Structure formats: structure tokens, C-alpha cells
């Protein structure tokens, strides 16, 4: 956010002697932050669909101003930003929205790309999602995110397709829920498996509920929730670590597997290993 502001000041106020320096500093920092905050598979390190798009929006606002004033954006920055944008497509549900992950929300992917296609020239995914250009349709159907730890399973890209998501993610940088191995399932225009969603950032009973394991489709142990929050500390090198996610995708079926072994209960003293695997039929079934 700060570099978005600094970059725009450097562009909009050329009468200041340091305006060009401010612009260059912003460009350098913005590209560095993509390396620092974005996993190699494209997800921002808070692992929430809402704040992921907040980050993209800050780049978007800066780049739009830069283009209007004839400034050049480095190709390397645009390539990294494009990868972050495509993450929304990898996660996208049949209704065209992102799932509500951690302190996230369900955002319309096509609407987001209507703006993004103006800032990333020749983005083939943007042309597909906004204009229906089949040349930009993903060559994949299901998608695994090896670093951020999600597996999005789907029978196709249509509104009547079936979609599932397995959360095998690390705890993330912020806005986390205690939800590892949670599963979402959506078919025929509705959720069959959902979760507690989000709530105001307060200390209410409802806020505690949506953060907890019991508001997600994963197990508790002896009535106790997962508790990674107690001892978790983000390290800069975590952005390069792969999640403990296994997967195999084929034309007829998909498979995803992970495990949770980081403790349950207030003191993390309940320490069984919970393993979960999903077998997903990857062909359409009209009635079941």
C-alpha cells in the first residue's frame, strides 16, 4: 500500500526533485514484495482470498496511473503479478467466485479480471475469463498449489460442474483459521460442504467460532480444536517451503492427501496425526 502511494506521488508530482527517485524506489520495492509475499504457486502469504486480492488491487491502482502517464512497468513485475492473478482462477468455483478461505470472502473473478486485463497486456487468462476466448482457457482442470497447500478439484469449468477444495495449507502470515484438512464441496449450484465463513474482527463468541476448527469440515480431538496459533511464527524463508500436500490428477479421477500433526487443545498437548485423503470423480455425473 505504501509503495502504491509513493509510486503514484512520484508520477503525479514531477515538480518535486526526488519524484523520479520515489518512483524507482516504489518499482523496486513492489517487485521485491512480490518475491517476499507471493508463494511460487501464486498465493499471497496470508492465504486468504480477500487479502490476496487487496494486494493485487494495490499493484493495479499504481500500474493504471503509470500507464496513463506513459511510464513503463518491468516485464518481470508483470509476470509475477500475472501468476498471482491466475491463483483466483485456479481456486474459482463453478459460480465464478473465489471460495471464502481464512478471513477471506467470495469475490467475482470475472469482475476482478475486467480491471486486471488493462494492466497486464496480452494476458490469455484475462481474455478467457472476460471475453470467452477459448485460446486462453486453462490447459488444466483441477489445480494443485504445492507451496500454499490447496488442491482445487473440478469436473470442468462450467456453472453446472462439481468442485471441491482441500486445505492442506501452512498456517499463513496472518488472518488464519484453525482449519487444516478442511474440505469444501459445491455442485449443481449449491454447497454440499461449507464452513463458518468470516466475522467482524472483535473478541466475540462468533468471531472465536469462525476461527475455530469446529466451524470447518475437519476433525477435532476429544472436543479440542487445532491450535497452530499458540506457537506459530512466520519466517521469511517459509515462502519457499512446500506444503505437505500429495496429489495425482487424471482424466477420470483426482486424488489429494495431507496430514495435520501440530497439536490440539489449548496447550497443544493432544498430538495424534490426522491424515486425510480425497478421491474425486473427475467426470460429470448427472444424477447421484
Give the ranges of each region predicted by the language model.
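Non-catalytic C-terminal accessory modules of carbohydrate-active enzymes
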Residues: 140-288
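Helix-rich, typically C-terminal accessory recognition domains appended to large enzymatic cores
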Residues: 16-19
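Short, charged, amphipathic alpha-helices and their helix-cap/turn boundaries
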Residues: 24-36
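Carbohydrate-active enzyme catalytic cores, enriched for enzymes
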Residues: 39, 43-192, 246-251
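Extended ligand-binding groove/face enriched in aromatic
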Residues: 1-4
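Blade-edge beta-strand/turn elements of extracellular beta-propeller
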Residues: 34-39, 276-278
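Short coil/turn linking the two alpha-helices of tandem helical-hairpin repeats
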Residues: 7, 11-14, 67
Amino acid at each position: 500500500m505504501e509503495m502504491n502511494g509513493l509510486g503514484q506521488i512520484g508520477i503525479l508530482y514531477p515538480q518535486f526533485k526526488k519524484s523520479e527517485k520515489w518512483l524507482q524506489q516504489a518499482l523496486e520495492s513492489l517487485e521485491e514484495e512480490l518475491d517476499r509475499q507471493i508463494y511460487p504457486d501464486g498465493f499471497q502469504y496470508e492465504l486468504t482470498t480477500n487479502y490476496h486480492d487487496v494486494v493485487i488491487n494495490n499493484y493495479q491502482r499504481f500500474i493504471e496511473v503509470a500507464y496513463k502517464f506513459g511510464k513503463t512497468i518491468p516485464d518481470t513485475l508483470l509476470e509475477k503479478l500475472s501468476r498471482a492473478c491466475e491463483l483466483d482462477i485456479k481456486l474459482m468455483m463453478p459460480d465464478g467466485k473465489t471460495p471464502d478461505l481464512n478471513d477471506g470472502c467470495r469475490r467475482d473473478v470475472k469482475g476482478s479480471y475486467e480491471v486486471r486485463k488493462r494492466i497486464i497486456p496480452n494476458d490469455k487468462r484475462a481474455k478467457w475469463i472476460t471475453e470467452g476466448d477459448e485460446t486462453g482457457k486453462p490447459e488444466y482442470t483441477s489445480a494443485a498449489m504445492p507451496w500454499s497447500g490447496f488442491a482445487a478439484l473440478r469436473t470442468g469449468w462450467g456453472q453446472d460442474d462439481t468442485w471441491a477444495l482441500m486445505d492442506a495449507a501452512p498456517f499463513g502470515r496472518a488472518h488464519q483459521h484453525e482449519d487444516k484438512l478442511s474440505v469444501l464441496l459445491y455442485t449443481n449450484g449449491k454447497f454440499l460442504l461449507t464452513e463458518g465463513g468470516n466475522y467482524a474482527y472483535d473478541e466475540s463468541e462468533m468471531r472465536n467460532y469462525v476461527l475455530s476448527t469446529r466451524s470447518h469440515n475437519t476433525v477435532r480431538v476429544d472436543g479440542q480444536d487445532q491450535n497452530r496459533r499458540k506457537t506459530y511464527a512466520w519466517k521469511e524463508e517459509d515462502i519457499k517451503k512446500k506444503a505437505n500436500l500429495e496429489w495425482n490428477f487424471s482424466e477420470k479421477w483426482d486424488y489429494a492427501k495431507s496430514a495435520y500433526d501440530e497439536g490440539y487443545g489449548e496447550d497443544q498437548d493432544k498430538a495424534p496425526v490426522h491424515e486425510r485423503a480425497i478421491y474425486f470423480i473427475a467426470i460429470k455425473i448427472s444424477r447421484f
